[in-house]
Amino acid sequence: MSRQRINGHESVGCDQSVSSGQSTNGTEDMNENKAHRRTVACVLNALRPQTVLDICCGDGWLSRALAQPTVVDGIDFYASAPEGYAQFQTADFNLGIPETFGQYDAAICCEAMGYLQNPGLFLQSVRAHLKPNATFVLSLPNPNYAGARINHLIQGFPRSYSWFTQNHSAEPHMPWLTLGLFQLWLLLGLNGFTDINVHEVDEKKPRRQSERIIGCFIKAYARKKIKSASSAAVAQLWRQALSDQVVYGRQLVISARLSALAEA
């Protein structure tokens, strides 16, 4: 049984299954390729919100993963209305959260930040639809894990993605924006969020021995930055950068709390 801190509180049991992991049609909601979903569900189940906004809700897996009755509303650009959602709207979240949605105890955005054209404006919109002290949870690919840094020598940084075949219209799989821990820490902080935490994802870390070697250099640099940090907040950021999840993990799951002092 694992313990982790979520917005300053210790939660228990985040390595346990929060549901059967099976959708109503028999397919797996949270298989090994979607381990980030288990982590996101764990964070929410520890917080026990009464209302949640699921941004880019896809197949509606979240409503089946929550351990207690929760009102879940959803937004998606491509998917149709999933079962179990109280309110759903097809919308382009590049334009922000539609005004028809209210304010929530929590919001999530899984595997969608890399598609955004205006991430700062998006976070401002999310903030407007969260109650004070509400939690925002997001997941996205980790662009800077040890193995990726080798690939950067070939494809550059940000990477020259091979699936870019046209630039005339949006497609379901056309991520372009490379956001890592440090960029998210900055963006979330600038938009009124605090208590920014990286959460463990159940994945093999590292996957290759070469990554472990590179990781030694990454961790040595992070330890040096912790010692020279100009503030406690910056030192905490580098401590999270030192974690195996950030150094070796393919996924990032990050939570942040909306400060009660943040302007709507």
In which residue ranges do the predicted regions lie?
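Conserved N-terminal segment of class I S-adenosyl-L-methionine
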Residues: 1-102, 106, 120-123, 200-225, ...
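Short, surface-exposed alpha-helical recognition segments that flank or form part
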Residues: 27-31, 114, 172-175
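Glycine-rich nucleotide phosphate-binding loop and flanking beta-alpha elements
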Residues: 59, 114, 144
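A short SAM/SAH-binding and catalytic strip from SAM-dependent methyltransferases
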Residues: 106-118
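S-adenosyl-L-methionine-dependent methyltransferase catalytic module, highlighting the catalytic core
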Residues: 117-128, 135-259
